[in-house]
Structures are given as structure tokens and as C-alpha cells.
Amino acid sequence: MAVLVDTGILYALADEDDAWHERTRDWADDVNDLLIVPVTVLPEVSYLLHSRLGAAAELAFVQSAAAGEVEIEPLRQQDLTRCADVMRRYPDIGFVDSTIVAMAERLTIETIATTDRRHFAMVKSRHTKAYQLVP
């Protein structure tokens, strides 16, 4: 099974003071699934890490991604088409979360690792009744 990983999870893993840190760390320690990070998540995580935790935290994240600790999923043209559909239907959902929905549908992934329960719980997917949100 594969899991798409959202920004909040990656940030929480790095920030020991984050409210989600412990739960996220415990989940990450136990998960055996393929972790897929949409390419659209990378700049968002990098920005948060650099602005809140500093350059060293951002560098550590980039190095772990470069080392293959997660799989990076590219954005495809069809994802952008679906992304626009999601953004039109759900105006509160922004670009990054919309691309996660589009990639989940394209890859037929039902599980999303996220701290953003509100957005992903409201989306009606084309391939599953509801996303399984972890941790």
C-alpha cells in the first residue's frame, strides 16, 4: 500500500514543539507503506522549515528527500486539470491540497498522511468513498 504525505506531516516530524510531532513520529516509526511526497509539497515544507526552524532544518529535509527516504511524485498535466476542478468545487482548498487529491486519484491511493483533517475530509474522491487520514 502507498500513502501520500502532506506538508504538515513532514513539518511536524522536524519540529519537536509541533502539536502533531509525537503522534506523527510514532506513526512514521511504525509505517511500512511506501511514502509518496507530491512534488508540490516540497517547496511548502522547505519554506516552513526555513522560516520557522532555520536553514539547517530545511537542509536536513532536502538531504533526506535526496537520499530517497520518500518517493517524490511529479505533477502531471492531468493532475493540473483535476486540481482546477477541485479548487473550483471547494474554494477553501488551495493548490497543494488539490494536487494531492489529483495525485491520489491518478495513483488510486486511498490513504493520506496529513494534519489537515478539515480539507481532505470534505473532498468527494472519484475512486474511494472517503480518504483514510493518518496518523
Question: What is each of the regions a protein language model found here?
Answer:
Residues 71-115:
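Active-site neighborhoods of divalent-metal-dependent phosphate/nucleic-acid chemistry enzymes
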Residues 1-37, 50-62, 126-127:
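Short, well-structured N-terminal submotif of metal-dependent ribonuclease cores
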Residues 30-34, 67-68, 89:
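Structured helix-beta-strand junction loops
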Residues 3-6, 37-39, 93-95, 116, ...:
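Histidine- and aromatic-rich ligand-binding microenvironments
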